[in-house]
Amino acid sequence: MREIKTPKAPVPVGPYSQAVEVNGFLFISGQIGINPETGKLVEGFKEQVIQIFKNVDAILEEAGLKRENIVKVTIYITDIKKFKELNEIYEDYFKDVSVKPARVTVGVKELPLNAEVEIEIVAVK
């Protein structure tokens, strides 16, 4: 087992790793839309989702993986009415991936730092 961390993604907001690689799997901890340069949550739902995917890309790159390696996505969203907007951004992110990952989206009351969305990723080598 090895910890994956990069300065190109935000430091965790709690006592956990950005990601952990074990037995060919990469488990990326839930990401919220924090800009790693400022350490601040970006404003706006769309902007948060886009920032999350930038953070995911940075962690994947540090682990030597790409979007094509993502097999499972778990999304937590505080306003299920934004599901359609989420799907549009998500579809664009995975547009060049031939096999789309499995996914679940869960509506929740609130998230850390008042984020509107949090995304957790599982990838495989």
UniProtKB/Swiss-Prot annotation:
PROSITE patterns: UPF0076
Example GO molecular function: deaminase activity
GO CC annotation: cytosol
Protein family membership: Belongs to the RutC family.
Protein name as catalogued: RutC family protein aq_364
Organism (species): Aquifex aeolicus (strain VF5)
